[in-house]
Amino acid sequence: MALPDFSMRQLLEAGIHFGHQTHRWNPKMAPYIYGARNNIHIIDLSQTVPLLHQALKQVSDTVAKGGRVLFVGTKRQASDIVADAAQRSAQYYVNSRWLGGMLTNWKTISNSIQRLRKLDEMLAGEAQGLTKKERLNLDREREKLDKALGGIKDMGSTPDLMFVIDTNKEAIAILEAKRLGIPVVAIIDSNCDPDKIDFPIPGNDDAARAIQLYCDLIAKAAIDGIARQQGALGVDIGASVEAPVEPALDPAPSTEAPQA
């Protein structure tokens, strides 16, 4: 396995170079802006390419060390894409609404996750002894909890890296990550503040094709990390399994010799 490849052409075709209207910009983004066309800022893809590669390496390295990546994208056009990419790469996601304290108050969130698990078990067992109304209420409670927490149900604890689409919309999530020292990989459009991001990726954060490309690449980087981790484990396991094989076989000829 290796880090996923991408080309400047792919970035262009996905519209990653299109920023927002010039009057909506954040001046801190000036170093990442190539110019303007028809009052739309054009993002400098010659900077996006190395920064995207750096972000992908960080994702792969984090997962290779056994770390967890949390995908965050709650805007309408990102929601399904984020969930699919996280599930495909055995990572975690928040794609409905960021609940305040999702990271900084993990203990409370854990209690809600336990409740979700309990509801899953109860309803899987057909909720015997419950009336239709009681079952309906449990179904609704489960649906609500699953929508909010289903993507982090199996995360176990706070993540080791966060990947964010739209830093303005997910400002609370980023703030919580910063408080806990969790590094953040994020797409920074022309109206974003790059200072808060550890691994910024300059690019459009609204177009569905752009979001699809980012998520696909991040997912592939995570899968690369999983392959590297398993490869490393395979070497260790192989060595430990092979070591006792020869001594175990040695006695065989000596026990047969007297019989011959």
Swiss-Prot record:
Record bears the keyword Cell division: no
Record has Ribonucleoprotein as a keyword: yes
Gene3D superfamilies assigned: Glucose-6-phosphate isomerase like protein, domain 1, Helix hairpin bin
Gene Ontology MF terms: structural constituent of ribosome
PROSITE patterns linked to this entry: RIBOSOMAL_S2_2 (PS00963)
CDD domains named among the record's database cross-references: RPS2
Example GO BP: translation
Cysteines paired by S-S bonds: none
Keywords: Ribonucleoprotein, Ribosomal protein
Gene Ontology CC annotations of this record: cytosolic small ribosomal subunit
Sequence similarity: Belongs to the universal ribosomal protein uS2 family.
Name the UniProt record assigns to this protein: Small ribosomal subunit protein uS2
Gene: rpsB
